Amino acid sequence: MAAPEHRTEKYARVSALEELLKDLNSNLAGANENYLKDSDERFTKIFLMGPHRSGSTLFLQWLANTGLAAYPTNLLSRFFGAPLVGAKIQQLLTDPRYNFRNEILDFNSEINFSSDNGKTKGALAPNEFWYFWRRFLPFDELDYLPGPELREKGDLAGLRDELNALANIFEKPFAMKAMILNQNIPELAEQFDKSLFIWIRRDPIFNIQSALEARKRQYGDINTWYSFKIKEYPQLKDLDPLESVAGQIVAINRSVEQGISQLPDHKKLVVQYEDFCRRPKYYYDEITRRVRDQDGLGGAAAPAYAGESSFSNTNIWRLEEYSSKDAAGAYERFQII
């Protein structure tokens, strides 16, 4: 088993909450099975891929705000073991269609564009939903398995059916982060006829800086590995922090590029974070076109775009331990390996 994490107090897990959720989800498992009867594939699943700290949280918050797709919320994440039950409860508590005389109006339905190491605030704000993914993936020391082994030991059919059923409950495409399978994209893609893989890339210099800053926030130093343990983890984990993170970003981008290379154009989209910040509507149009090409809207029309016209990106060098030139050099060294 992997070694225990030593998080800073702010990011430490709450053991009482973990136990409560484990008990709740275990007892709801049977009810969840009943909702799996409607798991035909009618809507597109939108998977966000790429390195951590590349802008994926902002992108998912933005996409959620457009109304095009449903997504895992902080409320839904509490039901990681019984998400179909959770989806029904979320509808009951938050969907205006089921509002009775304004009895329950306490849930925050607004989604802002702030986050902290991928974490958001608000019942209906997007959640990373990693506990859900791990139910189906037999990862241990590494967050990766060779394709044949993952197909044999994982429950990819179960993952497929629950995601299809979730989309059917919400009657929309379902969008979510899927970086836990950055290095197993073909195995995920083969589960769906209607899927869109979005590779979010960021200027690698600032991606490296942001990843190092995330280490410091999460663990109190820049030496401790942060995010999924990719297949290159054993070779990268004990390097100088800058080299470790640079190698991590290069390896992830390389894996995603290879993973989507065999997908048809209507099943993939490359998003450059800096360009997305300049013109988000362009990417909304690209997404909706691909979803329509898959007949992934269930016969409905895509909402007209009413979102942000632009975002400010955070590409300013702040790190004291290294310079931007150091980061560029480290990235280039791994690029040629």
Placement of each model-derived feature along the sequence:
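PAPS-dependent sulfotransferases, especially Golgi type II membrane carbohydrate sulfotransferases
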Residues: M1-D40, K216-I337
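Pre-Walker A (Motif I) flank of P-loop NTPase domains
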Residues: F43-K45
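The Walker A (P-loop) glycine that initiates the GxxxxGKT/S ATP-binding motif of P-loop NTPases
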Residues: M49-G50, K177
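Walker A (P-loop) phosphate-binding loop of P-loop NTPases
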Residues: R53
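A conserved segment at the C-terminal end of the G1
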Residues: T57-L68
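PAPS-dependent sulfation machinery
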Residues: R78-A175
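Short catalytic-loop micro-motif centered on adjacent basic/acidic residues
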Residues: P173-K177, V270-Q272
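Conserved phosphate-donor/acceptor-positioning beta-strand/loop module used by diverse small-molecule
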Residues: K177-M179, L188-E213
